[in-house]
Amino acid sequence: MVHIISKKTVSFIGQKLAAQIDEQLFTKYGFKVEQLMELAGLAAAQAIAAHYPKSNVAVLCGPGNNGGDGFVCARHLQQFGFTPSIVYPKESRNELMKSLVVQCETSSIPITATLPTNLQAFPLIVDALFGFSFHPPTREPFTEMLKTVRASGIHVFSIDVPSGWDVELGAPSGNDDDVIHPHSVISLTLPKLCMKNWTGPHFLGGRFVPKSLVDEHELLMPQYPGFEQIVKLED
């Protein structure tokens, strides 16, 4: 059972502050990208395991850090008894991403560049295409993929920011058939401003922010119970 807290007790942050917090974690505080990626992906997998029954899961991974979170999430989902398949439409040359690919390949997790032809065999899709640095609109090879996912009606779990959303303003108005409208979301570190009015299942993970960094930015951080890595936000 995931501990529930009021979303009024945590800060919602914009794109600039989110980037600043990451930069400070990687420099002043000595964290490595792969450390935080592992924690983020594990938190996402824990939220999924708490909210959904074991099933086939299609994990859509972009070439950046959000995609890395997706690879880690897929690996942990397999450990939790799910059957993940990764969709990786745009490969990264980054050595960390290459390592994550190897980790999943050697765990016999399928990796393809396109959506499965039997997409309806996957009751859940994990959206890990774009992170908080994304600026609309979407571009290929992602646009058509997002349209297919949107039209499928399959439940989508988004990691941090739903694909196609402006990080601060949320889903664009008008023609948005290439924009994910998720059924559930996990925010990482702190929820972004685009999630302020979100009313669906909303998890939060990222139990690693040093107190001095919290104090510097006067942030409201969640009170995680015991040794839990995620909480659930409600009104």
UniProtKB/Swiss-Prot annotation:
HAMAP family xrefs: NADHX_epimerase
PROSITE patterns per UniProt: YJEF_N
Entry binding sites for K(+): N66, D127, S163
Disulfide bridge positions per record: none
GO molecular function, one term: nucleotide binding
Co-factor remark: Binds 1 potassium ion per subunit.
Cofactor(s), names only, from the UniProt record: K(+)
Protein family according to the UniProt entry: Belongs to the NnrE/AIBP family.
The enzyme's E.C. designation: 5.1.99.6
Organism expressing this protein natively: Caenorhabditis elegans
Name of the protein described by the UniProt record: NAD(P)H-hydrate epimerase
InterPro entries: YjeF_N_dom, YjeF_N_dom_sf, YJEFN_prot_NAXE-like
Annotated keywords: Isomerase, Metal-binding, NAD, NADP, Nucleotide-binding, Potassium
Cellular component terms (Gene Ontology): mitochondrion
Residues the record lists as binding (6S)-NADPHX: N65, N66, G67, G68, D69, G131, F132, S133, F134, H135, P136, P137, D160
PANTHER family according to UniProt: NAD(P)H-HYDRATE EPIMERASE
Function in brief: Catalyzes the epimerization of the S- and R-forms of NAD(P)HX, a damaged form of NAD(P)H that is a result of enzymatic or heat-dependent hydration. This is a prerequisite for the S-specific NAD(P)H-hydrate dehydratase to allow the repair of both epimers of NAD(P)HX.
UniProt catalytic activity: (6R)-NADHX = (6S)-NADHX; (6R)-NADPHX = (6S)-NADPHX
Domain YjeF N-terminal, first and last residues per copy: 18-221
